[in-house]
């Protein structure tokens, strides 16, 4: 019996010594690197993930936390004219409405100020850079992030971040993996600065097709593998339908799939309408989600909310909600509350989402391995 007690005491003493050593190490780390340099994952003092709303209810719900995460990298990619820049501009508009400062790195030299203004962007306050080289673009982005004053920065697009050596070289010169190395170096530098400043960085990316793929999707994104690894959220956006008023096309039905999400369960899907000259229709998404969640009743073509008829036909109800933003806010708040998203996330103890069957259909091989990729 005595040997067993002795062993127990020895184990306890050893445990106390280890705890004292750990406490001393933590105190030294805190002294050298500041409070919060090391913390326990379950510590209640650990700040929750802050967000910047996308400006659309369906996208905020698909992201799982009510918007794009602050201090993280987000990649938005898809085919041409699918709505990538529109999504980013709406996020900028929301950040500005909340009193934040936004920056736009226009590497494609294609930003339309009039369109941005229609989406709600304060173009007078928006910081815009049209760099000559990829190095210049990423250096400007890094300096803005490290200032600590920027809430959101958009880089449009990764494919247009042309290395200086390629610009100064001759047509036909081979520059294998140059852009991939540039992105890898820049993201290594920016990741920590983004977290410390709470800045959201949205990288817009294009699709390419790999040559000779026999099985699976030949699609891949530009800029190598670094962005795929460093991004906390990756969104695949596609047009799925043209919206028409009679014979006239008035917009696109668009699907956004969250193919990677480090802050919430991934593979969620959002469908929304992008109206020409107007941007993403918030009201249309609110109507769809309110009906799906039983908040608004639909009987035939009539929509009813709390016993009061909203109108006949989705388009009329959409226009009615646009003229009554208070009602739109009320419906959106009830949707978030029922689904436990955004400020209601802490009150939701269990997942209410149906099992997700869709999976990413993009092959993520490094473009740096095959610079012979064919453009769309």
Curated annotation (Swiss-Prot):
<dbReference type="InterPro" id="IPR013765">
    <property type="entry name" value="DNA_recomb/repair_RecA"/>
</dbReference>
<comment type="function">
    <text>Can catalyze the hydrolysis of ATP in the presence of single-stranded DNA, the ATP-dependent uptake of single-stranded DNA by duplex DNA, and the ATP-dependent hybridization of homologous single-stranded DNAs. It interacts with LexA causing its activation and leading to its autocatalytic cleavage.</text>
</comment>
<dbReference type="GO" id="GO:0005829">
    <property type="term" value="C:cytosol"/>
</dbReference>
<keyword id="KW-0238">DNA-binding</keyword>
<dbReference type="GO" id="GO:0003697">
    <property type="term" value="F:single-stranded DNA binding"/>
</dbReference>
<keyword id="KW-0233">DNA recombination</keyword>
<dbReference type="InterPro" id="IPR020588">
    <property type="entry name" value="RecA_ATP-bd"/>
</dbReference>
<dbReference type="InterPro" id="IPR020587">
    <property type="entry name" value="RecA_monomer-monomer_interface"/>
</dbReference>
<dbReference type="InterPro" id="IPR020584">
    <property type="entry name" value="DNA_recomb/repair_RecA_CS"/>
</dbReference>
<dbReference type="GO" id="GO:0006281">
    <property type="term" value="P:DNA repair"/>
</dbReference>
<dbReference type="GO" id="GO:0005524">
    <property type="term" value="F:ATP binding"/>
</dbReference>
<feature type="binding site">
    <location>
        <begin position="78"/>
        <end position="85"/>
    </location>
    <ligand>
        <name>ATP</name>
    </ligand>
</feature>
<keyword id="KW-0234">DNA repair</keyword>
<dbReference type="InterPro" id="IPR027417">
    <property type="entry name" value="P-loop_NTPase"/>
</dbReference>
<keyword id="KW-0227">DNA damage</keyword>
<feature type="region of interest" description="Disordered">
    <location>
        <begin position="355"/>
        <end position="376"/>
    </location>
</feature>
<dbReference type="GO" id="GO:0140664">
    <property type="term" value="F:ATP-dependent DNA damage sensor activity"/>
</dbReference>
<keyword id="KW-0963">Cytoplasm</keyword>
<dbReference type="InterPro" id="IPR003593">
    <property type="entry name" value="AAA+_ATPase"/>
</dbReference>
<dbReference type="GO" id="GO:0009432">
    <property type="term" value="P:SOS response"/>
</dbReference>
<keyword id="KW-0547">Nucleotide-binding</keyword>
<comment type="similarity">
    <text>Belongs to the RecA family.</text>
</comment>
<keyword id="KW-0742">SOS response</keyword>
<dbReference type="GO" id="GO:0003684">
    <property type="term" value="F:damaged DNA binding"/>
</dbReference>
<dbReference type="InterPro" id="IPR023400">
    <property type="entry name" value="RecA_C_sf"/>
</dbReference>
<dbReference type="Pfam" id="PF21096">
    <property type="entry name" value="RecA_C"/>
</dbReference>
<dbReference type="GO" id="GO:0006310">
    <property type="term" value="P:DNA recombination"/>
</dbReference>
<dbReference type="Pfam" id="PF00154">
    <property type="entry name" value="RecA"/>
</dbReference>
<dbReference type="InterPro" id="IPR049261">
    <property type="entry name" value="RecA-like_C"/>
</dbReference>
<dbReference type="GO" id="GO:0016887">
    <property type="term" value="F:ATP hydrolysis activity"/>
</dbReference>
<feature type="compositionally biased region" description="Acidic residues">
    <location>
        <begin position="363"/>
        <end position="376"/>
    </location>
</feature>
<keyword id="KW-0067">ATP-binding</keyword>
<dbReference type="InterPro" id="IPR049428">
    <property type="entry name" value="RecA-like_N"/>
</dbReference>
<protein>
    <recommendedName>
        <fullName>Protein RecA</fullName>
    </recommendedName>
</protein>
């Amino acid at each position: 019996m005595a040997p067993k007690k002795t062993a127990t005491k020895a184990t306890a003493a050893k445990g106390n010594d280890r705890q004292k050593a750990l406490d001393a190490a933590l105190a030294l780390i805190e002294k050298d690197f500041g409070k919060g340099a090391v913390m326990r994952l379950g510590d209640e003092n650990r700040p929750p993930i802050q967000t910047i709303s996308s400006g659309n209810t369906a996208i905020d719900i698909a992201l799982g936390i009510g918007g794009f995460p602050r201090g993280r990298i987000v990649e938005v990619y898809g085919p041409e004219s699918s709505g990538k820049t529109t999504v980013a501009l709406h996020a900028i508009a929301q950040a500005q409405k909340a009193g934040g400062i936004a920056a736009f790195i226009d590497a494609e030299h294609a930003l339309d100020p009039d369109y941005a203004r229609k989406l709600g962007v304060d173009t007078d306050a928006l910081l815009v850079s049209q760099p000559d080289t990829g190095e210049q673009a990423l250096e400007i982005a890094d300096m803005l992030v490290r200032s600590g004053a920027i809430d959101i920065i958009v880089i449009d697009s990764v494919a247009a971040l042309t290395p200086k050596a390629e610009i100064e070289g001759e047509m036909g010169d081979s520059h294998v993996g140059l852009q991939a190395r540039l992105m890898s170096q820049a993201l290594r530098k920016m990741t920590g600065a983004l977290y410390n400043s709470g800045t959201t960085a949205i990288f817009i990316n294009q699709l390419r097709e790999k040559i000779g793929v026999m099985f699976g999707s030949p699609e891949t994104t530009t800029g190598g593998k670094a962005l795929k690894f460093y991004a906390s959220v990756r969104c695949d956006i596609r047009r799925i339908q043209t919206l028409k008023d009679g014979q006239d096309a008035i917009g696109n039905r668009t699907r956004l799939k969250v193919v990677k999400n480090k802050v919430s369960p991934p593979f969620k899907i959002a469908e929304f309408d992008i109206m020409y000259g107007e941007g993403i229709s918030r009201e249309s998404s609110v109507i769809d989600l309110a009906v799906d969640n039983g908040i608004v009743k639909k009987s035939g073509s009539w929509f009813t909310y709390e016993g009061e008829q909203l109108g006949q036909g989705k388009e009329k109800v959409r226009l009615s909600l646009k003229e009554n933003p208070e009602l739109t806010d009320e419906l959106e708040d009830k949707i978030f509350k029922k689904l436990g998203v955004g400020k209601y996330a802490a009150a939701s103890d269990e997942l209410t989402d149906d099992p997700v069957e869709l999976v990413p259909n993009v092959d993520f091989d490094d473009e740096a391995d095959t610079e012979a990729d064919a453009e769309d």
